[in-house]
């Protein structure tokens, strides 16, 4: 039975939001839904207005997936670089939506693209957030064979974030894909080791291990519900929290 999480609202000062490319598709099969992008921007703006420093890592699976292309014969590294470019497209869309709402925003890329974004420099990114700017990290880690989930765990640790929030198409972590298996079990809380041992397909093993090594909490929630980011920040609604064992 699904139960709504009711926990004492934690006090977050700085967080990283991982927005999957699929979360930006809306109900479409691919591409970017401008309505969905605007809704995500509105949620982020509300959280920033509450005094929380926010940075983002965006995926690119709504546009291109290097792993899928490699399965069809494309060189894996080339496919991953193409996927990095897809994340930059999503980042620019989110930047535009945030700036239309009056939010100062900076896009920083792991691969230099000086005409459209700043190069990723850790200290500069921290300074941007201290000034109240939203920082969007794009192009993953800048290296092939690493997912944007791993990039999210890496950047969250580099930015010394209090937690990593992953916005997806479902309201937490399940034992199987609930869109395909109606009997899938939903979890309110898991440990890093449980995620790895059960091979739960929420983030790749490298990302989970990186979070575990640095005791970085991960919160997985449904990005498609308006106001969901702010709600889970307050400990409300449905989500799954991944933490170290007691």
Swiss-Prot record:
Residues the record lists as binding UMP: 60, 80, 141-148
Residues where ATP binds: 18-21, 61, 65, 168-169, 174, 177
Main location: cytoplasm
This protein's UniProt keywords: ATP-binding, Cytoplasm, Kinase, Nucleotide-binding, Pyrimidine biosynthesis, Transferase
Biological or metabolic pathway of the protein: Pyrimidine metabolism; CTP biosynthesis via de novo pathway; UDP from UMP (UMPK route): step 1/1
Any Gene Ontology CC annotation: cytoplasm
Annotated control of activity: Inhibited by UTP.
Family: Belongs to the UMP kinase family.
Matches recorded under HAMAP family: PyrH_B
This protein's name: Uridylate kinase
Organism field: Gluconobacter oxydans (strain 621H)
Taxonomic path: Bacteria, Pseudomonadati, Pseudomonadota, Alphaproteobacteria, Acetobacterales
Gene transcribed to yield this protein: pyrH
């Amino acid at each position: 039975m699904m139960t709504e999480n009711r926990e004492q609202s934690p006090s977050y000062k700085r967080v990283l939001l991982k927005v999957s490319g699929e979360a930006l598709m809306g109900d479409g099969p691919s591409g970017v839904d401008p309505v969905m992008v605007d809704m995500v921007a509105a949620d982020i703006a509300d959280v920033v207005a509450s005094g929380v420093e926010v940075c983002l890592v965006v995926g690119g699976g709504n546009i291109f997936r290097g792993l899928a292309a490699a399965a069809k014969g494309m060189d894996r590294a080339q496919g991953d670089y193409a996927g990095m470019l897809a994340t930059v497209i999503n980042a620019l869309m989110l930047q535009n939506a945030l700036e239309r709402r009056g939010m100062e925003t900076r896009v920083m890329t792991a691969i230099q693209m000086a005409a459209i974004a700043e190069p990723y420099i850790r200290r500069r990114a921290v300074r941007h957030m201290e000034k109240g700017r939203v920082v969007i990290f794009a192009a993953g880690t800048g290296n092939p064979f690493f997912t944007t989930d791993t990039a999210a765990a890496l950047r969250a640790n580099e930015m010394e974030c209090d937690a990593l929030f992953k916005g997806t198409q479902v309201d937490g972590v399940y034992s199987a894909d609930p869109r395909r298996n109606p009997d899938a079990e939903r979890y309110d809380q898991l440990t890093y080791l449980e995620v790895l041992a059960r091979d739960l397909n929420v983030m790749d093993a490298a990302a989970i291990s990186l979070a575990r090594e640095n005791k970085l909490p991960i919160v997985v929630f449904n990005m498609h519900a308006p106001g969901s980011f702010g709600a889970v920040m307050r400990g409300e609604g449905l989500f799954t929290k991944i933490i170290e064992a007691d």
